[in-house]
């Protein structure tokens, strides 16, 4: 995160909001990292604990977002589905094929067609009935 913030600041003057993984807040490294990244100009730390009043849901923050920068986070999926460009820093990201790949692209992120990707993602969702009928396994087992 620290390196990512530094790289981002080299490529944009926009406000940077860090949204740590909700489980990360339990780590002892959490406060040290928070202190380090907040030293960088115009960097903000979003509270990850949903029980605290300063928590803002991702859907709310995306309404004001220019772009998201993720590794393999579900936030990238939320962003892309809501029309917000993403920079995917990890090839394992579910939005890798519809994202910019380099932090240096943050000011001009990928905004191309995502319909093929959306169709593929839609086929990753299964109902209980499809699990029970074996349809899900029939589809998934071809990839193993």
Describe the residue ranges of each PLM region:
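Well-ordered, non-membrane alpha-helical segments in soluble/globular domains
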Residues: 1-8, 30-36
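Donor nucleotide-activated moiety binding/catalytic core segment of transferases
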Residues: 14, 22-77, 81
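Hydrophobic anchor at the start of a short beta-strand
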Residues: 14-16, 43, 86-87, 115-124
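Short beta-alpha junction loops
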Residues: 20-24, 91-94
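Short, acidic/turn-prone active-site loops that include or flank metal/cofactor-
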Residues: 48-51, 91-96
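Short hydrophobic beta-strand element within catalytic cores of glycosyltransferases
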Residues: 68-69, 85-89
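Flexible glycine-rich beta->alpha loop in the catalytic core of nucleotide-sugar glycosyltransferases
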Residues: 74-75, 85, 92-93
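Leloir-type glycosyltransferase catalytic cores
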Residues: 97-144
């Amino acid at each position: 995160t620290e390196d990512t913030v530094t790289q981002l600041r080299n490529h944009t003057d926009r406000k940077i909001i860090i949204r740590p993984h909700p489980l990360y807040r339990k780590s002892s490294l959490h406060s040290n990292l928070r202190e380090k990244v907040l030293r960088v100009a115009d960097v903000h730390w979003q509270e990850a604990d949903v029980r605290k009043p300063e928590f803002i849901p991702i859907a709310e923050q995306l309404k004001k977002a220019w772009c998201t920068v993720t590794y393999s986070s579900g936030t990238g999926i939320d962003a892309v589905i809501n029309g917000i460009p993403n920079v995917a820093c990890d090839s394992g990201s579910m939005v890798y094929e519809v994202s910019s790949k380099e932090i240096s692209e943050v000011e001009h992120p990928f905004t191309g067609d995502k319909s093929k990707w959306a169709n593929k993602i839609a086929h990753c969702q299964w109902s209980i009935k499809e699990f029970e009928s074996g349809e899900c396994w029939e589809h998934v087992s071809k990839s193993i």
